[in-house]
Structures are given as structure tokens and as C-alpha cells.
């Protein structure tokens, strides 16, 4: 294959700016997929992606155009899935920057463009949705130049929906994106594993980009970090259906199957090379991202524990950013502490467990990872609030802080600043983007944005704001643990860590909310919030009262009192041994006790 005719590129875009539609048009125009087989969001293979209208998993497809071979690596646009984007960029030489002509640049697009520029990628600005009456391509061009600092005078104006000027995009890919550098088939194999997925018949299938050398069916290869060794049993490319090949060469993007059965044997981001002719240095992999949100997953039926474990292993194959470890809760039994990149990421995984593996589970309220220094100088990482040591053993607690970048219309700046201040934010900067839009920068505790920050931001700004963040490190905070007691018993899974200033109001809100969602039982249930031994709030869930006197007809009043007394004694006994049924809503109640809404 002539290496000068290969082009590897990604598409960078914010949610709803038309990335999946552009990918569909490219597949249609190049006849990679026949028109009769083409369906909307063709590269989005998960049902969840089509339903929500977002791309979650990256996908890679080979396209033939004239006498060129393109590898299009489709990427997600939501802030939680930045790790998928970083992997796509590591496998590309260039990127199409797709911007909605009616919306302009959004915060997430900005973050991904900077990521691409740091990787030395060639950027092609493309402005979409020019068919809409409210589009303003000239203003968007100006914004691209001023905000990102790249020349947009020859930005391509397209409508992915109608197919207008799509051919110009393909021509620009040929002219502007360089062919793969140093793509020599005779060098030792050097290939980046940028994704993997699980196939029930073939085991783990790797998606790879070959930088140097070649690999043939039957070759023995190994992962340079983990040193795990395998034989290549099948190779091929996606068009988007899988097409088998005897070999993959330098510059190509394809898939590799090696009968790998254990998910833990694969490390996405690693370099593979041949066992009998290894390359000296691995590729610089993309940064491995650490989870930022942790939650407990507990199967409703304890017999599903092993199935849950197996499912998490399979999902972590195609989603290497998930972490999980076994966890035990007095209230909920055996489960796992699972780490995610954000709340959407968590929702998607929960949905996948339910759909793909039929597992019903209870998810505890999400938490972030706190760094606790004890009085004897030991440093603990705590992501489960119930494990926080007693106050007298703690020297200091540090929590993760983020730098939030919010792009919004100027009329909402005041309201959003007020919300950020209420969430313990520290103002950093207010940048003028154009006549109507501003970029607001705040440092905020991650625990304050984890729950509903994004939803609140959208509702405050009528959906016009966009938001991106990066973690800047840990800072000391005055935090305390609030325990929840039901019927006098601490429920470990309901504990929360909050700032001292908000402890009383959060405790009060939580007891009120739990009273609403926990069903009434045959006995009275006190719901208490406590800091240490001190109860700071209390509500009572009233008992159902069974009418034990209904069968009496007239007769002696003492008979009536005797039956009521007997019922009371029975309830007392039930109270001492009675366990309270806790529905999933009780854990979600923690998310709805945000004091800044008041």
C-alpha cells in the first residue's frame, strides 16, 4: 500500500453539532455503506447511543475515496468521555473541527481542540448547519480565529443534513492532513492499542493503529507494558462491517483478535510489538485517566454478585477508565465500589448493566475521593464516606478541586456566578468571546459539581451554556461526615461528607427527603442525621395502623383495650428486630439535598 495515500483523522465536535450526521454523509458519499443500508448515526453501535443521540464509544472505519484510504475515528463529544477522544487523537494525524453555525464554539470543543493541538495534529475547521436560518458562519469563523487562534478564513461551510459541500471536506482531508510519518513496513512492529471490546466467540478484540512495521495472521506479539504474549489469530479492518485481512501494515488502523479470554490481560493505551523482532521503545500512550466519581453497586439479589463481577470485567474491557473493587456494606451486603469519569458515565454504565447483562442493582449516592491525613501522619484515600475515621483521629481532609470553564450568553453571567459562589467556587476570570458570549472561569470543589451542576447550569441559562473542567489538585477543606440513622441504626450506605457550613441544612433536607421516599412499615421509624454522637435533625415515618378491633361487635370496652395493648406489645417487639426496607430512591435523595437551591 502506498503510504502517501493514507489519511488518519478524527472529528472533534460538541454534542449536537452534527458529528455523527457528518460521519453518515461521508460513508454515503464514498459509498463505504450502500445508501439502502445506511441508517442514522451509523457508527454509533450501541442502542443507548442512538436513543440519547450521543456517541459514547469511539469507532474506527476504513473509507476508500478516489485512490486514497481514509481511517475515520469517530469520537464522543460529552465532557465525561474525553478519554475516548484522547485515544482517537493518539491514533490520528489530523482532526476536523466541526462547529455548529448557530451555536459557535462550546467549552468541550475548546478542550478537545487544545488536546489535538498538543498532540501536533493538523486542524481543519468545518462549519455545519449553514442551511438553518439562524446560522452565522462569518461570526463563527471570527470566533475560531480569536478563541482558538487558528486561521479560519478558508473554513469549509457545510450542511451535514442536506449533504452540501461534503466533498470539499474530503478534498481538504487529502490536501491538509499529512500522510503517516515514518510508516515503514520493514521496521519492527510498533502499534498502539487504542480500544478493545469483548466478543462472545472470539474473546477480546483489539483496535490498533500501526505506526511502524507490519503484523500477519499467526505472528506472536506481546504488550510492552504488561509483557503478556499472544498469537494473532485474525486481522482486519472495519468498513464499518468487519473485513478480514492477512496482514496489517504501517499507517493502517484495524482490528486484531488473538483468542484473549481474560479482560485483565489487555491494557488499552499499551504498545504491541512482535516477540521475535521487538521494537526498542513503546509509543507514548495517551494519559490514563483516573476516575473522579465513586459509587457503590450492590445487586438486589445477593446471588447475582458473581454475575455483577463478570459484567463489570467485560464492560471494563471496552471502557478502560472504569475502576472497581469489592466492597461490603452492613445495610446492603456484598457489592463493588465503582469509579467513573462523571455522572453521565455512571448512568450509562448502570443502564448497560441492566440492558446487556440483566442485572438489577442499587447504586449508592456518588462521592469523590478525599485525602485524609490522620493524627499519626498516615495518608488515606477515602471514596466511601462511611469509611471516614472519627473526627479526633483526623489531622486534615483534602478534597479535589477543578478549574471549570463555562461558555455562556452574557445575560446569564450574574446568575451563574451566584450559583458558583454558592457551591464554594473561587472566581478566576471572565473572558470576552464576542458581543453576546463570555467565558467564565472558576475553581470549584469537585464534590459540588458531581451531582447536578451541569443540569442546574443548563436550566439557569435555558440550555445555552456549555461546560468543561480539568482537575487541578487537592486542597484542604473543613469537611465532616453526616451519618443517617434509621430506627436508631446507622446506615453506612447513606453517610455523606459535606462542608461544615452546610452540614445542618444538608442533614435536615436529607431526613425530610428520606421520610418522603421510605415506605411506611408496621412500626414507627425515626429518621435521624447525626455528626458523631450528636443528632442534628430528625423526622418520623408514621406506622400503618391495622384495625385489630374491627371484628368486635359492641361488647365490653375492656376487650377492645386488651386487643390494642396486645398490638402495641407486638409492634414493640417488631421495632427491636424490624429492619427497614430501603428503596433506590433513598440513595438518590442524597443528590437532591443541595443547599444552593434554597
UniProtKB/Swiss-Prot annotation:
Name the UniProt record assigns to this protein: Elongation factor 4
Catalytic activity reported: GTP + H2O = GDP + phosphate + H(+)
Pfam families: EFG_C (PF00679), GTP_EFTU (PF00009), GTP_EFTU_D2 (PF03144), LepA_C (PF06421)
Chain ranges of the tr-type G domain: 4-181
EC number: 3.6.5.n1
Known function: Required for accurate and efficient protein synthesis under certain stress conditions. May act as a fidelity factor of the translation reaction, by catalyzing a one-codon backward translocation of tRNAs on improperly translocated ribosomes. Back-translocation proceeds from a post-translocation (POST) complex to a pre-translocation (PRE) complex, thus giving elongation factor G a second chance to translocate the tRNAs correctly. Binds to ribosomes in a GTP-dependent manner.
Record keywords: Cell membrane, GTP-binding, Hydrolase, Membrane, Nucleotide-binding, Protein biosynthesis
Protein's membrane topology: Peripheral membrane protein
GO BP terms in the entry: positive regulation of translation
GO cellular component: plasma membrane
Molecular function terms, GO-annotated: GTP binding; GTPase activity; ribosome binding; translation elongation factor activity
Gene: lepA
Family: Belongs to the TRAFAC class translation factor GTPase superfamily. Classic translation factor GTPase family. LepA subfamily.
Subcellular location: Cell membrane
The organism of origin for this protein: Mycoplasma mobile (strain ATCC 43663 / 163K / NCTC 11711) (Mesomycoplasma mobile)
Record-listed GTP binding positions: 16-21, 128-131
NCBIfam families membership: lepA, small_GTP
Amino acid at each position: 500500500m502506498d503510504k502517501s495515500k493514507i489519511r488518519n483523522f478524527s472529528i472533534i465536535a460538541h454534542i449536537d453539532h452534527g458529528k455523527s450526521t457528518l460521519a453518515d454523509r461521508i460513508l454515503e458519499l464514498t459509498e463505504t455503506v450502500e445508501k439502502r443500508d445506511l441508517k442514522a448515526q451509523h457508527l454509533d453501535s450501541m442502542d443507548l447511543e442512538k436513543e440519547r443521540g450521543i456517541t459514547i464509544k469511539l469507532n474506527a472505519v476504513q473509507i476508500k475515496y478516489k485512490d486514497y484510504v481514509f481511517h475515520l475515528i469517530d469520537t464522543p463529544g460529552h465532557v465525561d468521555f474525553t478519554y475516548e477522544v484522547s485515544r482517537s487523537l493518539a491514533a490520528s494525524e489530523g482532526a476536523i473541527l466541526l462547529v455548529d453555525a448557530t451555536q459557535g464554539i462550546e467549552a468541550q470543543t475548546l478542550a478537545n481542540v487544545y488536546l489535538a493541538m498538543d498532540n501536533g495534529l493538523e486542524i481543519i475547521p468545518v462549519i455545519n448547519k449553514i442551511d438553518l436560518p439562524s446560522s452565522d458562519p462569518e461570526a463563527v469563523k471570527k470566533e475560531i480565529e480569536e478563541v482558538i487562534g487558528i486561521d479560519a478564513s478558508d473554513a469549509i461551510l457545510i450542511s451535514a443534513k442536506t449533504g452540501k459541500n461534503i466533498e470539499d471536506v474530503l478534498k481538504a482531508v487529502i490536501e491538509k492532513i499529512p500522510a503517516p510519518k515514518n510508516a515503514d513496513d520493514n521496521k519492527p512492529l510498533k502499534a498502539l492499542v487504542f480500544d478493545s471490546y469483548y466478543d462472545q466467540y472470539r474473546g477480546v478484540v483489539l483496535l490498533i493503529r500501526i505506526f511502524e512495521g507490519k503484523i500477519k495472521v499467526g505472528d506472536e506479539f506481546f504488550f510492552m507494558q504488561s509483557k503478556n504474549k499472544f498469537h494473532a489469530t485474525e486481522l482486519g479492518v472495519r468498513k464499518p462491517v468487519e473485513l478480514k485481512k492477512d496482514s496489517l501494515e504501517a499507517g493502517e488502523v484495524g482490528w486484531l483478535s488473538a483468542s484473549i479470554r481474560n479482560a485483565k490481560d489487555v491494557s488499552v493505551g499499551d504498545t504491541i510489538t512482535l516477540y521475535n523482532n521487538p521494537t526498542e521503545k513503546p509509543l507514548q500512550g495517551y494519559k490514563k485517566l483516573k476516575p473522579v466519581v465513586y459509587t457503590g453497586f450492590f445487586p438486589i439479589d445477593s446471588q447475582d454478585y458473581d454475575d455483577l463481577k463478570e459484567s463489570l470485567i467485560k464492560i471494563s474491557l471496552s471502557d478502560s477508565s472504569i475502576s472497581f473493587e469489592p466492597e461490603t456494606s452492613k445495610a446492603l451486603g456484598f457489592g463493588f465500589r465503582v469509579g467513573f469519569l462523571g455522572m453521565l458515565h455512571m448512568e450509562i454504565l448502570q443502564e448497560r448493566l441492566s440492558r446487556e447483562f440483566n442485572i438489577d442493582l442499587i447504586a449508592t449516592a456518588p462521592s469523590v475521593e478525599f485525602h485524609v491525613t490522620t493524627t499519626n501522619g498516615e495518608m488515606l484515600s477515602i471514596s466511601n464516606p462511611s469509611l471516614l475515621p472519627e473526627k479526633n483521629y483526623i489531622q486534615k481532609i483534602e478534597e479535589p478541586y477543578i478549574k471549570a470553564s463555562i461558555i455562556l450568553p452574557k445575560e446569564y453571567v450574574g446568575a451563574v456566578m451566584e450559583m458558583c459562589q454558592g457551591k464554594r467556587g473561587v472566581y478566576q476570570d471572565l473572558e470576552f468571546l464576542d458581543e453576546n458570549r463570555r467565558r467564565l472561569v472558576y475553581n470549584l470543589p469537585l464534590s459540588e459539581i458531581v451531582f447536578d451542576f451541569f443540569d442546574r447550569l443548563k436550566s439557569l441559562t435555558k440550555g445555552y451554556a456549555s461546560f468543561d473542567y480539568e482537575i487541578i489538585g487537592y486542597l484542604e477543606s473543613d469537611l465532616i461526615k453526616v451519618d443517617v440513622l434509621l430506627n436508631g441504626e446507622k446506615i453506612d450506605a447513606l453517610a455523606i461528607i459535606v462542608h461544615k457550613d452546610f452540614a445542618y441544612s444538608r442533614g435536615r433536607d436529607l431526613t425530610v427527603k428520606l421520610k418522603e421516599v421510605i415506605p411506611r412499615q408496621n412500626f414507627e421509624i425515626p429518621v435521624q442525621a447525626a455528626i458523631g454522637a450528636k443528632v442534628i435533625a430528625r423526622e418520623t415515618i408514621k406506622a400503618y395502623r391495622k384495625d385489630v378491633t374491627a371484628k368486635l361487635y359492641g361488647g365490653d370496652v375492656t376487650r377492645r383495650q386488651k386487643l390494642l395493648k396486645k398490638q402495641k406489645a407486638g409492634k414493640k417487639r417488631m421495632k427491636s428486630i424490624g429492619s427497614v426496607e430501603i428503596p433506590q430512591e433513598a440513595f438518590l435523595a442524597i443528590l437532591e439535598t443541595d443547599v444552593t437551591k434554597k
